[in-house]
Amino acid sequence: MSSVYDFNVKNANGDDVSLSDYKGKVLIIVNVASQCGLTNKNYTQLKELLDVYKKDGLEVLAFPCNQFAGQEPSCEIDIQAFVADKFKFEPTLFQKIDVNGDKQSPLFKFLKNEKGGFMFDAIKWNFTKFLVGRDGKIIKRFGPTTDPKDMEKDIKEALGEKL
């Protein structure tokens, strides 16, 4: 596997989606949880970024994960409703996954191998964000406590790069 475009994932409805459908877009791939202390800030700021840059080719791909303190116990339909109702935000939501361990998503295994974390590669908490360029290559990994607005410079640079 050489880029995120090589992966197929399941959307919130359980349908197969090829990430090659996003060729030419700049992606923020993020593991999300509804009951995390980081939820409000991340969803609010991701929505703001998408509102500004979607027209330029930015997409947010959200992968619910319940591996961290059980902070995403809901089903995908409830997660989608929560995010839409509370934040007026509609990221592209995918099926709930594991981001670490024996049952980890192949996509997140690839992301971690391409851009390891501080001290070790495992995803440490909810809202670890990967910025992916228009070519499907990972540009940068941002930790859970990095505010999405602090990614804006890197997002602008990525959006400026044409294929």
Curated annotation (Swiss-Prot):
Full protein name: Glutathione peroxidase 1
Cellular component aspect of the GO annotation: cytosol; nucleus
Any one GO molecular-function label of the UniProt entry: glutathione peroxidase activity
Entries under InterPro entries matching the protein: Glutathione_peroxidase, GPX_AS, GPX_CS, Thioredoxin-like_sf, Thioredoxin_domain
Compartments (UniProt record): Cytoplasm
Organism: Caenorhabditis elegans
Gene3D superfamilies from the UniProt entry: Glutaredoxin (3.40.30.10)
EC numbers: 1.11.1.9
UniProt KW Oxidoreductase keyword: yes
